[in-house]
UniProtKB/Swiss-Prot annotation:
GO cellular component assignments: Golgi membrane
InterPro entries attached to this UniProt entry: Sec-1-like_dom1 (IPR043154), Sec-1-like_dom3a (IPR043127), Sec1-like (IPR001619), Sec1-like_dom2 (IPR027482), Sec1-like_sf (IPR036045)
The protein's name: SEC1 family transport protein SLY1
Pfam families linked to this entry: Sec1
Amino acid sequence: MALTLRKKQLDSIVRMLHLNQQLQGSPDGVGGGVGSAEEEEAYKILVMDSPCVALLAPVLRVGELRRHGVTLHLNIDKARQQVPDAPAVYLLRPTAANVDRVAADAAAGLYASFHLNFSTCVPRALLERLASATAASRSAHRVARVADQYLDFVCLEEGLFSLAQPRAYVALNDPAAAEADITALVDAIALGLFCVVATLGAVPVIRCAGGGPAEMVAAALDARLRDHLIAKPNLFTEAASTAVASFQRPLLCLFDRNFELSVGIQHDWSYRPLVHDVLGLKSNKLKLPEKYDLDDTDPFWVANSWLQFPKVAEEIEAQLAKYKQDVDEVNQRTGGGRDGVEFDGTDLIGNTRHLMNAVNSLPELTERKKMIDKHTNIATALLGHIKGRSLDGYFECENSMLVDGTLDRTKLMNLLRGNGTKEDKLRLAVTYLLSFETPVPSDLEQVEAALRESEVDMSAFQYVKRIKSLNSQFAGASNTASKVNIVDWAEKLYGHSISAMTGVRNLLSDGKQLAATRAVEALMEGKPNPEVDNYLLFDPRAPKSGTAGQFRGPFREAIVFMIGGGNYIEYRSLTELTQRSQTTKQVIYGATEILNGVEFIQQLSELGQKAGLGGVSSSLPPQ
């Protein structure tokens, strides 16, 4: 079974847009076979709340909505005009406020009929609330259908999803949090994961380390799946007929962000993590101020987003040169060449053919030029930050500590006292703290003094110092690798054309396998391994009293979920795992939210402040 999460989410959305009818001419209702059905279908209105707008945006664009008969897409929280002759498709989270708005819309007769779709299972109490309200207004006849869609997750691409649950790390690690709030968040995470596996149509085998949020979420999800599987038929009935052996079912690996803190903080040198960290990529969209989409419709992004930044610059330069060459060829075919050989005035058919070929190539050339310009602008913007903040130096220093376990004290102190934002310096200092089991006291004092000199809020640093001893995993990977010198970006590159970047040597990022990747690889193999032998196992299909030892693997497919925030660095590491595997493996990566280093260090700072640690001080400690 292939884990085609994005495709299956898209299929569900398209069926919903077609009023939950199975489309003719296309097995999945998404391909080109739906054209005639769409042309004959009456137009409709799509009404969503903001969270559902966010989950829809990465999988369907406005033009694609029109293909499926949607002429207007509106936010339920904003004023809307009456369209009494059109059916309305609602996609909403099941909340009391949303139910009340639907009831008010029905009472006002805004639309001809109401096809209500909830992103998760709607509680019975809310259904009764809706029924009572529509009955009181005599508008119940307008409600044509109520459906649970189990779509409450954002699928950014085929192998990456987010539950869009902000600040989960803070909520789960705040010592002052009420037990009821923790339980509610754990249940919400479990419900989001239930939506993911329900969309896939597969009941997973769940593995996690004992204790902490991962075990709490695993237990809640196991209970929810067991309750659902009691009913026949259910969302997994079809999958159950084929997934009879453990290797035919996916593995769901749950991790707590504290399992490896450093990867959420460190700087990276690859194109995609840089764009996310430095330029603020969100939901596959970027604003520079130009607005760009960076997703699987962009062939350059798909092919090069995991390359190191200098390699990306080389590829931009190569594609620009190829584009210019192709433009010159078109000019020659249309008589624009210097010798005009193609058009000698005697071969009308040949000349016409050349002209038609040239004209047909123009749209493709135009799109290529747009793509090249887009990535040139992005790379130029990145280069400005690299120069102004010495980001290459931060990456090299952090990489040396995390991968080699070596410390260049001079470089560390120069960075802490030199270029870079306060967040850059704080991330470097926390990475230093996490890289060594027992930092040298004099080094630690110098690091703290440098942070104070730069007036950096010490809350996150002090918070990590406090919790570090609770988890030996924090030390990070200890793999060794050779070093490489780095050129001075500030003096040699900034202010030059994009071609100036192509000669830069790539910075070392090999040799380090992240802790989550090592654990996932061991869990998928299913062999005895001291790193994961003590992991808990939950199998919702097995009797609670029975042993589930036979379900320990091997597994070909896995869903890896990070509770408290994921990132593109971890996603890349898991992608590389599947690429180097001798057997075919597939891994989907998800998290409560996708965070860059600044966003995560801010959550650590918030926890430090809640604990009364750190703060900003410009004074040096007493000598």
